[in-house]
Amino acid sequence: GVNLGGLGFLTEIPLRNLYPAVTLMLEGRLEVETRLMLEAVVVRQGTETCRFLVLNDVVINKGALARIIDLDVFINDQFLTTFRADGLIVSTPTGSTAYNLSAGGPILYPTLSSFILTPICPFTLTNRPILLPESHVVSITLSRRGEERVSLTFDGQVGFDLFQGDRVLIQKAKEKLKLIKSPDQGYFEILREKLMWGGAPFNSRDEGQQRG
């Protein structure tokens, strides 16, 4: 993608390099990268109420009140745990540098065939992120919510209210996203530039003094 402004984590090609990049693409000299996507289904009282395709993450989050919620999580129909937390993030490798990273989850290399479950502010210190292969199916049931509102969001764009007993099924989608990679930057260079990863931020004056 071409970055027309903003952080542009997925749009690796700056606007100044648009025409050279188009030339390389037409010549078949640009690498195409395939990214995992997720499918999320909400089941209420045995009936499917919505289905969404997700590139970055599925997030279950409590409302404005400072109360935790209980989420029963099953992996391939086997009980994993009950997360007592502010919420839960299910993230793809593409989305691992977004909300997942802010919540203490790891960065996943974007072409990995896996996804990650990351609790948001868990009540129990032993509740930590867990990495799963793409073949696994995750089932999350809202077992307790009290009076507060609990929201389910898809890629931070679409919101959906969850009620006690609702079940969210998440699995690998049949669809894949194909991205054209920048010929000038690798993934780790993008991490350093966009997220200031692996070191303290510096400005051009600091860089000039170091070179001098």
Language model features with spans:
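A generic structural signal for short beta-strands and their flanking turns/coil linkers
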Residues: 34-38, 54-56, 67-71, 86-88, ...
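Gly/Ser/Thr-rich active-site loops/lids in small-molecule metabolic enzymes
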Residues: 82-85, 90-126
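Catalytic core of DAGKc-family lipid kinases
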Residues: 9-86
